[in-house]
A protein has these predicted regions:
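Intrinsically disordered, low-complexity Pro/Gly/Thr/Ser/Ala-rich repeat tracts
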Residues: 1-159, 268-447
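Glycine-centered flexibility motif
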Residues: 80, 84, 108, 185-188, ...
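Long, charged all-alpha helical bundle/coiled-coil segments in cytosolic proteins
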Residues: 134, 142-143, 180-190, 227-228, ...
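Short, charge-rich amphipathic alpha-helices with coiled-coil/heptad character
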Residues: 161-193
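Long, amphipathic alpha-helical coiled-coil/dimerization segments that form elongated scaffolds
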Residues: 196-331
Length: 447
């Protein structure tokens, strides 16, 4: 498999976009097993009491499961075998064969009254209900498809909730797995945040106009007589607020209705929503076709049946033996091209047809094929979506502007400065008056 829990961008992206924390990819199939830890299916190998030609009804499941639907979860693969239980069958030409049937029951949901295989369903723990083809001791087998459905179907449904529901993923739950309140994602929050900045910008613009009118009434320049007095403090207040509100309005406003931060947030939210929609669409196409791993099991078993037909079932002959009394007996034998291994269309050999380890490997291979589909259809596209949002929200693109406070002293500092200026001016005026008085006295004495 080309990705794992750490690199599962689909699981990570859905968590990031919706707050829905789906099970990790490595945990989906640990409890979805049959006998002998065979993934996704139960298998029983039975040696038949006599050798005969294959019953075509045993292969009807291939017709039932044509396409992507799994209408029949009860499969039979008939095959012939030479030698003892361990021999592979190579160089078996002429050897007498015995007749076996590998009986399969796929564990999970299928077409019919339960639900369409290619659609969404909630899984969970199940208990086997087998007919007499399987041993009574196997009837207690249980398996759990819950983690798989939480991953395969819950993730897509969480994206749909984000995009379509008022409140986003608030209250969302799939098969017992919910989005807690602290992780809820609501697309409307972008509009609310942007609107808040718009209102703040409008507030400063409106108040700045009011303060400017007040400023005109009290004078655009401070009256020297007011310095160091309550009137001076009031003038400083109007002047400082007017300047700061003017700066805030200039920094925040964008046009008559909007704000710089508000527009940046709206653009970021638009990119977020667009990428979430893409993910939901990729998922919708994938789940109807490849969401159910049982379709991959059916496909792989069909490939193996093709090989069994070509190299096993159609490669036997028979001999008729006549006893002294005229009684006849028929035996069946392998021809030169006879083989008895499970091989897929790519030539991969999973082992002898009569070994449960072989079918365990087949189940594991079907899971890997399903994961490959997840990688190509979900994981890769999720990586692109996360990159797109990251780029749109990077500091170089997500520019909320710069909101600065004009430099200036506090009102108390302005008051102390005005008071000091006033005292200094009074001292200078007093000194100037004293100087002039002294000059006048000197002039009088000279006369």
């Amino acid at each position: 498999m080309s990705f794992s829990e750490d690199s599962d961008r689909w699981q990570q992206a859905v968590y990031y976009f919706t707050g829905y924390d789906a099970p990790h990819i490595d945990k989906l199939f640990t409890e979805w097993v049959g006998n002998d830890d065979i993934p996704l299916m139960k298998v029983e190998l039975t040696k038949q009491s006599r050798v005969t030609y294959v019953d075509v009804d045993d292969l009807q499941w291939r017709v039932d499961n044509a396409g992507r639907g799994v209408n029949n979860t009860d499969f039979v693969i008939p095959f012939y075998k030479t030698g003892n239980e361990e021999e592979s069958g190579k160089d078996a030409a002429g050897d007498q064969v015995t007749y076996y049937k590998a009986r399969f029951t796929l564990l999970g949901n299928h077409n019919g009254k339960d639900r369409p295989t290619g659609g969404v369903y909630e899984g969970g723990e199940n208990k086997a209900k087998y007919d007499n083809d399987f041993k009574k001791s196997d009837e207690g087998t249980t398996w759990d498809t819950g983690p798989h459905t939480q991953y395969s179907y819950g993730t897509g449904r969480a994206l749909e909730a984000l995009l379509d529901n008022d409140g986003g993923t608030r209250g969302f739950e799939w098969n017992g797995l919910d989005v807690p309140a602290e992780r809820v994602v609501d697309l409307a929050s972008f509009a609310r945040a942007a609107g808040a900045f718009d209102r703040v910008a409008q507030f400063y613009a409106d108040r700045q106009a009011v303060l400017e009118e007040w400023h005109k009434r009290v004078g655009m320049e401070e009256n020297d007589a007011w310095k160091g007095t309550a009137a001076g403090v009031f003038w400083d207040l109007i002047h400082t607020l007017g300047k700061r509100y003017e700066d805030y309005a200039d920094d925040l406003r964008k046009g008559a209705m909007f704000s710089v931060p508000g527009d940046a947030i709206r653009i970021a939210g638009s990119v977020f929503q667009k990428e979430a929609r893409k993910l939901q669409q990729h998922w919708a196409r994938w789940e109807i076709k490849d969401g159910n791993p049982l379709s991959f099991v059916s496909d792989l078993l069909s490939e193996i049946v093709d090989h069994v037909w070509d190299t096993n079932i159609t490669n036997i002959t028979y001999k008729v033996h006549t006893a002294a009394r005229g009684e006849t007996r028929t035996t069946y034998h392998a021809t030169g091209n006879f083989r008895q291994d499970a091989v897929d269309k790519n030539g991969k050999n999973y082992g002898p047809l009569n070994s449960l380890d072989t079918w365990k490997a087949v189940g594991a291979a079907a899971i890997e094929r399903w994961k490959k589909s997840v990688k190509e259809n979900l994981v890769d596209n999720a990586d692109l979506a996360l990159r797109a949002v990251h780029d749109a929200w990077s500091p170089s693109v997500f520019d909320v502007g710069t909101i600065k406070t004009s430099s200036g002293d506090s009102l108390s500092q302005d008051y102390e400065k005005d008071k000091a200026d006033k005292e200094k001016k009074e001292a200078e005026e007093k000194a100037e008056k004293y100087r002039k008085e002294q000059e006048a006295k000197e002039e009088k004495y000279r006369k």
